[in-house]
Amino acid sequence: MRPLTMSGHFLLAPIPESSSDYLLPKDIKLAVLGASCVGKSAMIVRFLTKRFIGDYEPNTGKLYSRLVYVEGDQLSLQIQDTPGGIQAQDSLGQMVDSLSKCVQWAEGFLLVYSITDYESYQSIRPLYQHIRKVHPDGKAPVVIVGNKGDLLHARQVQTHEGLQLANELGSLFLEISTSENYEDVCDVFQHLCKEVSKLHSLSGERRRASIIPRPRSPNMQDLKRRFRQALSSKAKAASTLG
């Protein structure tokens, strides 16, 4: 399953040299979470370089940075890769030490499982619950990704199972093949960047609304002066009538 293709509006750009008149882009901070060997690092590298590399050393948690253009807006994208080792039976408490800092830092999340590994699918729910515990307002966007969609002969997780889980959690679901389709990978990151950017826009509008100056109230000296003027006017009117 895929959303509407958006890759044509998504460009990678080199980070420019610093300049005094260079306008800093918005920061977009994403985290890619999931069990071991589901293709998290491959997804990130595929997105950033368009190349697919199948074999990786065990990940120790790398941070990738790149300038991107989303529908004409320049964004400074940071993607945190995370170590695997998350199992379905892990409690939220067991995940705190290894993931809380990353989850607190990030603004949007990719939860990745492999369609060839049912246990990796079962780890998605506790990961999602941990995100919502750290971000209780429920605004941080989450996309659930079923990776390795080209390995149909080894499938253990059916498409409808991924869709059902995403519906229960209120998240977007996509089933992709990192190795075979760059556009699908790009669409995943594109969607998440747009959702985080929307949050930035909304929070910016709220901040601007909160600092709109209130009408200045007259101070006490002004009130006393007006009161004396009113009394004086009444006194003059009374003496005239008398």
Swiss-Prot record:
It is an enzyme of class 3 (hydrolase). Pfam families: Ras. It is found in: Nucleus, Nucleolus. Keywords: GTP-binding, Hydrolase, Nucleotide-binding, Nucleus, Transcription, Transcription regulation. GTP binds at residues 34-41, 81-85, 147-150. It comes from the Eukaryota. Its main location: nucleus. SUPFAM superfamilies: P-loop containing nucleoside triphosphate hydrolases (SSF52540). Disulfide bonds: none annotated. GO terms for biological process: positive regulation of transcription by RNA polymerase I. The keyword Transcription regulation applies. It catalyses: GTP + H2O = GDP + phosphate + H(+). The keyword Acyltransferase does not apply. GO terms for molecular function: G protein activity; GTP binding. GO terms for cellular component: nucleolus. Residues 17-241 are annotated as: Small GTPase-like. Its EC number is 3.6.5.2. Interacts with UBF/UBTF. PANTHER family: RAS-LIKE FAMILY MEMBER 11. Belongs to the small GTPase superfamily. Ras family. Regulator of rDNA transcription. Acts in cooperation UBF/UBTF and positively regulates RNA polymerase I transcription. This is Ras-like protein family member 11A. It comes from Rattus norvegicus (Rat).
